[in-house]
């Protein structure tokens, strides 16, 4: 019993370590996208950059697509709802999802994000 008391005293006497600081993504949180074709390139750059620097969080295509969906509003959000309802394979295919967004919202660039 005395040994436990001594151990407890020793543990209590140790200085507390400061709580580990949570890692913070240095890229600004992406703005939402409402379907405006002119903003689609900017939206893709913002979301891609944000995910690129945090590969641990966005470790697979399904997580990347899910993140994109959370940033959709208005007509863009309405567009994606049928894909969610029918559990489309595009929800697990980041490049395919981006290609479909580009097609639907009228961006004809060949650039690969």
UniProtKB/Swiss-Prot annotation:
Alphabetical list of Pfam families matching this protein: DUF4939
Superkingdom to which the source organism belongs: Eukaryota
InterPro entries: DUF4939
Note: RTL8B is one of at least 11 genes called Mar or Mart related to long terminal repeat retrotransposons. They do not correspond to functional retrotransposons, but rather to neofunctionalized retrotransposons genes.
Family as reported in the entry's similarity comment: Belongs to the FAM127 family.
Protein name listed in UniProt: Retrotransposon Gag-like protein 8B
